């Protein structure tokens, strides 16, 4: 059955569909030995030979992994500074997976990894509004007015964050510490940290508690598990 080239590349885990479109337009993809730059191009998986930068792209089994990331690991496939990467925690995973979004080195909690470009796009693109839930421990105690700013949206650098759900879990005025529950559907670089800084708080610890309905329940820190078919469907159909 015919399939659009960019969709096939995304399904093979090359990148998100949007990024695959860019790769095609850049002339990096060939079909049966001929460079293709037209996005409407259709191919027949298993029959047509698809190459990216001269290397054949072969569809592999789609896998979806939930990792309980510890602090101290960078969210990347490889690191030029030779720091520990989350890939080192995936013992037994043979497929070539990539992180779905990013948690900085000092953030712990739920991180998804996959080789399914469509799944990655669904989770990471803001238009799909897949929720990401965090628990933040901060130096400084926010006022209700501060919390409302986070709920409405705060200006960070050159953009204003989308509305967020925010609840104060702990207020310790004596030690000047608080714990805040934050749920967003964006995923910009260090967004939650910057949101807290925007209202005068300093982040002591940050943990991602969930993505959509997924949590790290039953998964020890530094360990991982495969998502079930139902969990994948719930994400894709949300």
Predicted regions and their residues:
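Basic, flexible Lys/Arg- and Gly-enriched helix-loop patches that mediate nucleic-acid binding at interfaces
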Residues: 1-238
């Amino acid at each position: 059955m015919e399939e659009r080239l960019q969709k096939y590349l995304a399904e093979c885990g090359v990148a998100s569909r949007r990024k695959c479109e860019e790769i095609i337009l850049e002339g990096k993809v060939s079909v049966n030995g001929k460079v293709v730059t037209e996005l409407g191009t259709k191919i027949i998986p298993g029959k047509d030979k698809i190459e990216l930068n001269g290397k054949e792209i072969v569809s592999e089994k789609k896998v979806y992994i939930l990792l309980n990331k510890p602090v101290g690991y960078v969210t990347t496939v490889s690191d030029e500074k030779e720091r520990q990467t989350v890939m080192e925690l995936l013992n037994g995973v043979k497929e070539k997976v990539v992180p779905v979004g990013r948690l900085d080195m000092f953030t712990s909690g739920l991180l998804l990894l996959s080789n399914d470009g469509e799944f990655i796009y669904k989770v990471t693109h803001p238009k799909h509004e897949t929720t990401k839930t965090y628990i933040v421990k901060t130096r400084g105690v926010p006022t209700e007015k501060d919390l409302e700013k986070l709920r409405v949206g705060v200006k960070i650098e050159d953009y204003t964050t989308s509305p967020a759900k925010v609840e104060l879990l702990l207020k310790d005025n004596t030690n000047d510490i608080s714990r805040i529950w934050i749920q967003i559907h964006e995923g910009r670089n260090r967004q939650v940290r910057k949101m807290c800084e925007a209202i005068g708080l300093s982040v002591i610890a940050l943990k991602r508690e969930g993505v959509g309905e997924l949590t790290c329940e039953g998964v020890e820190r530094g360990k991982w598990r495969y998502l079930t078919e139902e969990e994948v469907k719930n994400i894709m159909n949300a």
